Amino acid sequence: MKKTILLVLALAGVSLSAAQPLAQQQFDIPKPTPKWFGERIALPPKGFAPDLGLKGIEEILFAPGMFKADQPDFFTYVFLFAVEAKPELTAKVLQKELFTYYAGLSKARLGNPKLDTSEFAVTVKPMKPFELKPKEALESKSFTATVKWIEPFATRKMQTLHFELQTWKYAKSPHQYLFVCASPQPRDKDIWKTLRKIRGGVALKPVK
């Protein structure tokens, strides 16, 4: 009985959190090791993609070798978008917004607002539901994607990133959520086990 009561209270706390304004929502995104590091930014990101059509917040968690081109976990990371109800996060919308995000990031980091992005490309494909999903996620949808862009931090060369994307909602919430696992390594490599485990541990912190 006690466990049941605690579970009900926890679910109620999550529902209250999900109903809060996006800027007030907080998330648990588990770190595989203490060396993983992250940040939180507002969407759209005014510094590099002000034209992004999604409004809310982004939580990012980077692998230790994120910005070190000689490391096996180079440019490997996860991020979470908590955004308004519109536009709906369909494959078409995700493709458009990912292009805006990464093209803007390249231009800003390279200091070239007129950067030629004609060779940039984003593909998004719906998939069967992934086995692991964030806790309390409802109406989840799964996608894979690739992003071809100029990696602007370390190599400044063309790079192909592989993605797993999952969208979902929470009970009694008007908002949408997106979790992305990203790496230049193909999805059958060991690093993806780590990324998927992170996704399975994501949770909206309940209101206390």
Model-assigned labels for residue ranges:
Residues 135-208:
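Short, well-structured beta-strand
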Residues 4-14:
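Sec-dependent N-terminal signal peptides
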Residues 44, 94-101, 191-194, 198:
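Stable alpha-helical elements in mature extracytoplasmic
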